[in-house]
Amino acid sequence: MPEKSAQPVMEEEVETFAFQAEIAQLMSLIINTFYSNKEIFLRELISNSSDALDKIRYESLTDPSKLDSCKDLKIELIPDQKERTLTIIDTGIGMTKADLINNLGTIAKSGTKAFMEALQAGADISMIGQFGVGFYSAYLVAEKVTVITKHNDDEQYIWESAAGGSFTVKPDFGESIGRGTKVILHLKEDQSEYVEEKRIKEVVKKHSQFIGYPITLYIEKQREKEVDLEEGEKQEEEEVAAGEDKDKPKIEDLGADEDEDSKDGKNKRKKKVKEKYIDAQELNKTKPIWTRNPDDITNEEYGEFYKSLSNDWEDHLAVKHFSVEGQLEFRALLFVPRRAAFDLFENKKKRNNIKLYVRRVFIMDNCEELIPEYLNFIKGVVDSEDLPLNISREMLQQSKILKVIRKNLVKKCLDLFTELAEDKDNYKKYYEQFSKNIKLGIHEDSQNRKKLSDLLRYYTSASGDEMVSLKDYVSRMKDTQKHIYYITGETKDQVANSAFVERLRKAGLEVIYMIEPIDEYCVQQLKEYDGKNLVSVTKEGLELPEDEEEKKKQDELKAKYENLCKIMKDILDKKIEKVTVSNRLVSSPCCIVTSTYGWTANMERIMKSQALRDNSTMGYMTAKKHLEINPAHPIVETLREKAEADKNDKAVKDLVILLFETALLSSGFTLDDPQTHANRIYRMIKLGLGIDDDDSVVEEISQPAEEDMPVLEGDDDTSRMEEVD
């Protein structure tokens, strides 16, 4: 266009528009509120550029001529320290005049109001892109923004605003940009860090390193260059020339030597000067590893990516790289770390370590809906082709796409663990670190409970120092055995020596040792495995394989000891629900079992140690205790004889209480009044040593109530104790 007409057109065609009210309000909020993470503006502008490039690439699929105006699809960043500007250029689809006016100011996006409400409610500014208003984040760092854009179907236009409630649009008759958009940020004085090479690289690496188009940073730099003095400083040249004239009489004409001198002279007349040049650096050369074919990726590459993703100093233990195609399309790369984080189950910790990308654009890294809590140790990335780029947390919660992604991720994780289980050594390392997660999964994830139960490993009465699976246990079950037997407790030694496993071990029945607190919660949900019920050997109603003769013998013993059971129940009263003859004891005189639906002793211990426990629940879950006596034990047999001879014998009452309290301890319970129990033991020791009560001062210190602890009588009782022993 002729030069003379350019100026009038510029003046005439500058149009001023007012920002739509909600947008003006949003900009005011962005400008006047302090935000610590202002760097997200660059992520949003690069993301917008990537979207524009996606659009032109899509259009070119049906009409290749769309790319004629510019073949290369790219993003460029140009900082200018002198002018304090940062320019973001893309060769995307560009905007028409109407697009400029509508998209950048006069028509509010649906998310504008929602984002302002979220901001005022304390949401992070970094969520701005999820509401479709990411462009306005430019005003976090810029006092004025200029947008130059060219669409294939329109002329080149300039949009400009200093956020004063209005913006201008005018035709641009300057240098053509071909196609695309050029955003020039005139930075605020205190935001000049964003023209520094190091800072720009840092922000791009953090937020946009996996954008699917090359992002090139153009930096003006200086370098030293050797130049001839004729090309350099003329004044020095003249001085040298004057010096040469002065020295001319001394120069001899010696042929070859003259050539050497002239060479030396030429060398001396070189000088280093600084020159400016543009250094172009591609910032996202690392193409997303998850978009590549898994067959082409080495373990070293996976290891490097895992370390950069997780900041872990160790290599990963296992990796799963897969893509899902069809109605839904996404790629995922999942890693199992070598060790569990120390704060894995802390409530304040972010719920997962999987980064969510949408078409290579990072969306968020703590999307709770992406993976269940019990898999929160898995690290990796998920890149969806179907989710919208401007998706919010609220939308994610309702997203059917995300639910399908989640289901696939869980399935693939379980497949990965199953594959890992085939390598015994590596699975042992994995299980040591993450067994709690599997058990938590069994408690929470009913759909995958069967698969998760295959991953469990336990010590058993027959496994020695090796942990075995439930499948191994079932394969070793006796033909007459109907159930899977287990016992819960604090340590392997404690449960192995427990009175509850005596009969089972004698009969050659394998018992699973569950010695982690979370096992109690796990077996509440894992009722059966492979059609076999899991049965606790510490609860009432234990069914053991027995023949008709054994059943008949048991019935006879029940009848024989029925009276003793009644006497013991009367003595213990509310402390116990009932007293029965046991079928599980061999060498112990008695034990305390709990009701089928009540807590085990181990669970009661765990619940008592909870800082925020509910005491009302404690009441009814711990109330039902049953005392089981061993009819084959001499203590019980002798006690029966004495009780039948005189059921009001005070020694019988004292011995029954002592037996009960000792059984509580050996069965894993705690005593409500340990001091009274201790005093009973001390008095037994005194009797054994022949010490008279009058010689002791212990009674003066703590004399229990007479009704709680009947007085034992002198020598006669000593002989009784000998009989019991």
UniProtKB/Swiss-Prot annotation:
It comes from the Eukaryota. GO terms for cellular component: A band; cytosol; melanosome; myelin sheath; neuronal cell body; nucleus; perinuclear region of cytoplasm; plasma membrane. Keywords: ATP-binding, Chaperone, Cytoplasm, Myogenesis, Nucleotide-binding, Stress response. Residues 243-253 have a biased composition (Basic and acidic residues). Strongly expressed in the early embryos within the somitic slow muscle progenitors, the adaxial cells that lie on either side of the notochord but not the notochord. Also expressed during the early differentiation of fast fibers. Detected in developing cardiac muscles and pectoral fin primordia. Not detected in mature muscle fibers. GO terms for biological process: cellular response to heat; leukocyte migration; muscle organ development; myofibril assembly; positive regulation of nitric oxide biosynthetic process; protein folding; protein stabilization; response to metal ion. It is found in: Melanosome; Cytoplasm, Myofibril, Sarcomere, Z line; Cytoplasm, Myofibril, Sarcomere, A band; Cytoplasm, Perinuclear region. Residues 228-242, 705-716 have a biased composition (Acidic residues). GO terms for molecular function: ATP binding; ATP hydrolysis activity; ATP-dependent protein folding chaperone; nitric-oxide synthase regulator activity; unfolded protein binding. Residues 675-725 are annotated as: Required for homodimerization. A motif (TPR repeat-binding) lies at residues 716-725. Residues 228-273, 697-725 are annotated as: Disordered. Induction: Up-regulated by heat shock in embryos and larvae with highest levels of expression in 3 day old larvae. Transmembrane segments: none annotated. ATP binds at N48, D90, K109, F135, R393. The TPR repeat-binding motif mediates interaction with TPR repeat-containing proteins. Belongs to the heat shock protein 90 family. Homodimer. Interacts with unc45b and myosin. This is Heat shock protein HSP 90-alpha 1. The gene is hsp90a.1.
